From Swiss-Prot:
Biological processes, Gene Ontology terms: defense response to Gram-positive bacterium
Organism superkingdom: Eukaryota
Name under which the protein is recorded: Ribonuclease pancreatic
Region (Disordered): 1-24
Binding-site residues for substrate, renumbered to this chain: K7, R10, K41, P42, V43, N44, T45, K66, R85
Keyword list, A-Z: Disulfide bond, Endonuclease, Hydrolase, Lyase, Nuclease, Secreted
GO cellular component: extracellular region
Family: Belongs to the pancreatic ribonuclease family.
EC number, as in UniProt: 4.6.1.18
Database matches in Pfam families: RnaseA (PF00074)
């Protein structure tokens, strides 16, 4: 079974590009990362930074998660991210997405040993 840390990497890490390469980026990425397998995932964020930099956030600013848990951490620096949001015309299995580029602080939930990101909570 896929570990929570591996799932985070599959769903949220794209270190190979510095930003969304094209308007089709989200459609391709959401499909290739299996985020549209049994439904269209409405919103998903990809982080364009080295994995080590994202893992390091787990030792940065401790903040409360949206669900009230206390194991969330906010990055000290801004990171290059792409938000993929489902379009109005999107209908499973033909999921369609719009990409929004941003440089924001990310907030991730961390757990385990080693202490690594397992959930993308927000960007601010």
């Amino acid at each position: 079974k896929e570990s929570a840390a591996a799932k985070f990497e599959r769903q949220h890490m794209d270190s190979s590009t510095s930003s969304a390469s094209s308007s089709n980026y989200c459609n391709q990425m959401m499909k290739s990362r299996n985020l549209t397998q049994d439904r269209c995932k409405p919103v998903n964020t990809f982080v364009h930074e080295p994995l080590a930099d994202v893992q390091a956030v787990c030792s940065q600013k401790n903040v409360a998660c949206k669900n009230g848990q206390t194991n969330c951490y906010q990055s000290y620096s801004t990171m290059s991210i792409t938000d993929c949001r489902e379009t109005g015309s999107s209908k499973y299995p033909n999921c369609a997405y719009k990409a929004t580029q941003a440089k924001k602080h990310i907030i991730v939930a961390c757990e385990g040993n080693p202490y690594v990101p397992v959930h993308f909570d927000a960007s601010v």
